Amino acid sequence: MQNTLEKQKIQSRRQIYPSLSMRIDRLDRMLDMMLEYQTQIPEALSEDFGHRPEMLTKFAELAATFDSIHFIKKNLKSWMKPERRKATPPFNLFGAKAYIQYQPVGVVGIISPWNYPFNLTFGPLAVVLAALTISPVVVVIPDESICVTCD
C-alpha cells in the first residue's frame, strides 16, 4: 500500500493542471462506464449482499451517482473561473490585479464503505476528478466485503 501511495505522489507531481475539457472527458468516461455496466452492477451488489433489490441499487447507487456527475458537469466551468480579489497595498496603487486560481495538489484517498459502495465511491470520485483544489490522482480502497462488486 505504501509503495502504491508513493508512486501516486510522484505521478501527481507530474500531472498538468487539468483543463475543463479534460475534466469533462473524465466525467463522461465515468458515465459511459456506468451505463455500460448498469445491469452488472446491481447483480454484483446483490451477490455481495446475499440479496439486494435491483431497484434499490438503481436508485440509491446509480441514479444518485448520475445526478452528482451531471451537477458537477453543469457547474464545472463556473467553478474553474479565477476568483478576483483586491490587490493589497502598495500593489493596488500601481493597478495590480489579484486572483485566486485553484490548482490540484497531492493524492486523494477514497475508502468506500460496505453499505452503499458504488455511490459512496463514485460520487466522491466524480468530485475529485472535477475538483479544483485536490488532485486528479486518486487511490480507491473498497471494503473487503464487496469483492464481487470490485471485480
PLM-predicted stretches and their roles:
Residues 88-151:
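Rossmann-like NAD(P) dinucleotide-binding subdomain of oxidoreductase/dehydrogenase enzymes
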Residues 1-97:
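N-terminal Rossmann-like NAD(P)+-binding subdomain of aldehyde/semialdehyde dehydrogenases
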